[in-house]
């Protein structure tokens, strides 16, 4: 594992660091918007007094703190999408890979980083028996993950049941209902926190008890970017039919759904996705700062 000079320096000087994933850049956003947004994420982290650590695998080397040039190279190298399970494969086969929530959380934790910002976690898909690695990884990795909950394409109730079963503490930032996007809030109740200091305190108490699971901080999408639920559900039904007809499954499902949602919504879901990501990065910075108090 290679830790960049800026991240290593921040670790040595005990500065707040926020980990960022590469899958949303390589597979979640279209080119060239993805590279522009990646830079904006890092700028937000710096502006909030923290150090960004974008994580990915470049030609078999795990990198914590990808440079702008390395990120461009990663995107251009047709990277595979890897969860924790596939990290060793990517390394051994000298593959370039974009890291998902599970693999980013694992690598960040191994590097000593305590806070990670993402868009949404993977969960339990509707219909077929498809459960994301993210939940399993969060059950055994000591990190705070800030997300906008999970995508409305998932089975929200079952996702929360899995999080509970695997002892992943899930808290809502200024809400007692689990967020989903692009609809803001579900009807499923969770614990509520009011500020970053409370989240940091919960994490510190958890560590005193040597509980190794993550804390999932669910941060609702800003209200101005919420999309109509009926509209989104209509798109999802159309896409689910396409997925069945084309026999798309496994890791290919989510990227396909996100791409088609952007197309069917005329770009509205893409705009919402970028806004919620930036919103999560800002909250992650506040939490990282609070952990240093």
Swiss-Prot record:
A GO cellular-component term linked to this record: cytoplasm
Keywords per UniProt: Glycosidase, Hydrolase, Lyase, Manganese, Metal-binding
InterPro entries named among the record's database cross-references: Indigdn_synthA-like, PsuG
Database matches in Pfam families: Indigoidine_A
GO annotation terms (biological process): nucleobase catabolic process
Enzyme class (EC, first level): lyase
Catalytic residue list: 21 (proton donor), 151 (nucleophile)
Requisite cofactors: Mn(2+)
Subunit field text: Homotrimer.
Protein's name according to its UniProt entry: Pseudouridine-5'-phosphate glycosidase
Species, as recorded: Thermosipho africanus (strain TCF52B)
Lineage: Bacteria, Thermotogati, Thermotogota, Thermotogae, Thermotogales
